[in-house]
Amino acid sequence: MKSRFENALASAPESLSRHLAPIILAADFDASLSTVQFDELLKQTGMTDNQLRVALLPFAAAYSYAPISEFYVGAIVRGLSGTLYFGANMEFDGVQLGQTVHAEQSAISHAWMKGEQGLSDITINFSPCGHCRQFMNELSSAKELKIQLPEREEKKLHDYLPDSFGPSDLGIESALMSQVHHGFATEDDDALMQRAVEAMNRSHAPYTHNLSGVALQTESGRVYLGAYAENAAFNPSLPPLQVALIQLLLAGERFENIQSAALVESHKGKISHLACTQSTLEALNPDIPVSYLSL
């Protein structure tokens, strides 16, 4: 990761690389920029807000894991708190393409798992595909969400997705990233399973009712959570494992570091993530133990 950042710094404008390097090369950099950090960079570089976000995209793309396409995409979302969160596309060797995570989904789920309850804007390298436009339409802030592309005027999501189909068309009032706690608890004393339940309580699954969460523990002892993000169009839904894997990559860890995994889901769900979770983790490392609980 450090070498990717160094390459991006070498290609960035000098005023940006000089002031950004101490931030992103720090051991505790977590793929996000606080409002204070971003405002300081604006002053130090003399760039506009839009220009700086676009200039930061190569640093978001540095997190890309794309062994199949070798097409590295970065995205940056700004939460309602003002914090900026990086994201990048993620692919898996030996797993069907439906498990792929797009850069927009990565950045959005990053902000979501860090506690944001909505987004004001998203900045991306390339025009968002239909899959991602639909994914963003599930957000609590979809009506106001702005999209910034390089060398283009900022537009709202619904300029890219007119006459959209969304949760309201299915009679659903809840939205992805809205504050929620589903109230699940378990008597299981396994610490990793307890964390998976924590993620489950934040999940969004109004269509299948498969409220679910994943927790991954790595060799470092750190735990990464993923909550299920369901979508009105079904296919753009983001499984809890992928959300957890995104958090892991954006923390600078590697899939090879995963020691154990836990999945918990509602017994009332019309689907199950168990088989896909097991098969995807097996493709990463067949020795990863997976604990499972249905509540």
From Swiss-Prot:
<dbReference type="InterPro" id="IPR002125">
    <property type="entry name" value="CMP_dCMP_dom"/>
</dbReference>
<feature type="binding site">
    <location>
        <position position="132"/>
    </location>
    <ligand>
        <name>Zn(2+)</name>
    </ligand>
</feature>
<dbReference type="InterPro" id="IPR013171">
    <property type="entry name" value="Cyd/dCyd_deaminase_Zn-bd"/>
</dbReference>
<feature type="binding site">
    <location>
        <begin position="89"/>
        <end position="91"/>
    </location>
    <ligand>
        <name>substrate</name>
    </ligand>
</feature>
<protein>
    <recommendedName>
        <fullName>Cytidine deaminase</fullName>
        <ecNumber>3.5.4.5</ecNumber>
    </recommendedName>
</protein>
<feature type="binding site">
    <location>
        <position position="102"/>
    </location>
    <ligand>
        <name>Zn(2+)</name>
    </ligand>
</feature>
<comment type="subunit">
    <text>Homodimer.</text>
</comment>
<dbReference type="InterPro" id="IPR050202">
    <property type="entry name" value="Cyt/Deoxycyt_deaminase"/>
</dbReference>
<dbReference type="GO" id="GO:0005829">
    <property type="term" value="C:cytosol"/>
</dbReference>
<dbReference type="InterPro" id="IPR016193">
    <property type="entry name" value="Cytidine_deaminase-like"/>
</dbReference>
<dbReference type="GO" id="GO:0008270">
    <property type="term" value="F:zinc ion binding"/>
</dbReference>
<dbReference type="InterPro" id="IPR006263">
    <property type="entry name" value="Cyt_deam_dimer"/>
</dbReference>
<comment type="function">
    <text>This enzyme scavenges exogenous and endogenous cytidine and 2'-deoxycytidine for UMP synthesis.</text>
</comment>
<dbReference type="Pfam" id="PF00383">
    <property type="entry name" value="dCMP_cyt_deam_1"/>
</dbReference>
<feature type="active site" description="Proton donor">
    <location>
        <position position="104"/>
    </location>
</feature>
<dbReference type="InterPro" id="IPR016192">
    <property type="entry name" value="APOBEC/CMP_deaminase_Zn-bd"/>
</dbReference>
<feature type="domain" description="CMP/dCMP-type deaminase 2">
    <location>
        <begin position="187"/>
        <end position="295"/>
    </location>
</feature>
<keyword id="KW-0862">Zinc</keyword>
<dbReference type="Pfam" id="PF08211">
    <property type="entry name" value="dCMP_cyt_deam_2"/>
</dbReference>
<dbReference type="GO" id="GO:0004126">
    <property type="term" value="F:cytidine deaminase activity"/>
</dbReference>
<keyword id="KW-0378">Hydrolase</keyword>
<comment type="similarity">
    <text>Belongs to the cytidine and deoxycytidylate deaminase family.</text>
</comment>
<dbReference type="InterPro" id="IPR020797">
    <property type="entry name" value="Cytidine_deaminase_bacteria"/>
</dbReference>
<keyword id="KW-0479">Metal-binding</keyword>
<dbReference type="GO" id="GO:0009972">
    <property type="term" value="P:cytidine deamination"/>
</dbReference>
<dbReference type="GO" id="GO:0042802">
    <property type="term" value="F:identical protein binding"/>
</dbReference>
<feature type="binding site">
    <location>
        <position position="129"/>
    </location>
    <ligand>
        <name>Zn(2+)</name>
    </ligand>
</feature>
<feature type="domain" description="CMP/dCMP-type deaminase 1">
    <location>
        <begin position="48"/>
        <end position="168"/>
    </location>
</feature>
